[in-house]
Every structure is written in C-alpha cells, then in structure tokens.
C-alpha cells in the first residue's frame, strides 16, 4: 500500500493494535492513523512539533507515545481528540523504544543521554550517559535488548554503547565501527 497525506517527511510508522491500522509520525507536525483496508487516513492528531519517533503501548492500539523535536514526549489516547501528560526532556528526542512489558520507555535525547521512563508513574527513573557517548544526529536510535536487561545505542564516534538496566552501568563499548 502507498498512503499519501503527510506534507513532509514521515519518520515513524507502527502498527496500531491490529494489522489493518497504522499510525505515522511526520515532520509536518501530525500523527495520522490509517485504515489499510480502505487505504485512507481516518484520523489526524496535531502535535505542535515535528514527530521523530513513536511507539504504541498497549495491544489494543489505544495508546500512542510520540517523541518530538521540541523536547517533548506526548501521550495520545486514540479514543479522544487530544494528548495528555506530556513529559519535557532536556533535548530533542531522537528515538523511543518500549520495554517488552510496556512498563518502561527508553528515549534517546540530543543532550547525549538516554532517559528511562517508568510509564506507570510517568517519570524519568534513570539517565544513561557515558564519557565519549554523543548522540550524533536527529535520527540516532536506542533500543532495549529482547530480554529488557540492556539498552544499546550508536554514538557519533562509531561506537556502540551498551548499559545494564539493572545496574545502570556501562556493560561494554563496541568499537568495531570506528
């Protein structure tokens, strides 16, 4: 399918609870929800800032979390018109990743940190940083390991930094890309 409707770059797309609905985030400052059967946009949410990444936080597809260039993480309920409970971070958000249990959100931030948020409390519970680690561009991506015990991210120096979520300490720095 080709879906048209955004008027700027689309930087994020995720399935929304079922294989027939997709949500997209764009530099046109909107989120769009698409019905793949009709190939049409069924809802547009105006975010106020360029959306760089998004995740869906429940199996039903009713919650969307979006990360923006205005340093804000926004929470959206697809059953209502507007967002709620925004969290402002100290830099542009370059990526979001959701833990397997959907309790934690990992955000990569242009202030050269990763922030771990507890979604039950809607607050930052830890900040990962390291000497030498630099978020090199607006599209740097961070991710949880499949077991949720580690987080990994690439750095502008070509290294991969891996932290333990339990100890909050650097586990290793892989320099094979340098």
Regions picked out by a protein language model, each given a short descriptive name:
Residues 14-20, 55-61, 97-103, 143-148, ...:
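Loop/turn segments within WD40 beta-propeller blades
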Residues 104-107, 118:
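C-terminal amphipathic alpha-helical segment
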Residues 66-67, 102, 148, 159:
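Intrinsically disordered, low-complexity segments enriched in small/polar residues
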Residues 1-10, 16-20, 29-52, 57-63, ...:
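Per-blade loop-tip surfaces of WD-repeat and WD-like beta-propellers in eukaryotic adaptors/scaffolds
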Residues 133-162:
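Loop/turn-rich, solvent-exposed surfaces of beta-rich toroidal or solenoidal domains
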Residues 7, 25-28, 67-70, 108-111, ...:
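Conserved strand-to-loop turn within each blade of WD40 beta-propeller repeats
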């Amino acid at each position: 399918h080709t879906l048209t409707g955004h008027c700027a770059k689309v930087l994020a797309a995720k399935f929304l609870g079922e294989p027939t609905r997709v949500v997209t985030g764009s530099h046109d400052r909107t989120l769009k929800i698409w019905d793949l059967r009709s190939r049409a946009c069924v809802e547009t949410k105006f975010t106020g800032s360029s959306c760089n990444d998004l995740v869906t936080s429940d199996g039903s597809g009713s919650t969307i979390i979006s990360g923006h260039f205005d340093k804000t993480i926004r929470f959206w309920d697809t059953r209502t018109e507007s967002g709620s409970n925004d969290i402002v971070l100290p830099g542009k958000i370059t990526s979001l990743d959701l833990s397997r249990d959907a309790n934690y959100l990992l955000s990569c931030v242009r202030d050269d940190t990763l922030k771990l948020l507890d979604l039950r409390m809607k607050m930052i519970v830890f900040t990962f940083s390291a000497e030498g680690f630099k978020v090199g561009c607006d599209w740097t991506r961070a991710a949880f390991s499949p077991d949720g015990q580690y987080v990994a991210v690439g750095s502008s120096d070509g290294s991969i930094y891996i932290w333990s979520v339990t100890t909050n300490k650097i586990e290793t720095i892989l320099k094979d890309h340098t």
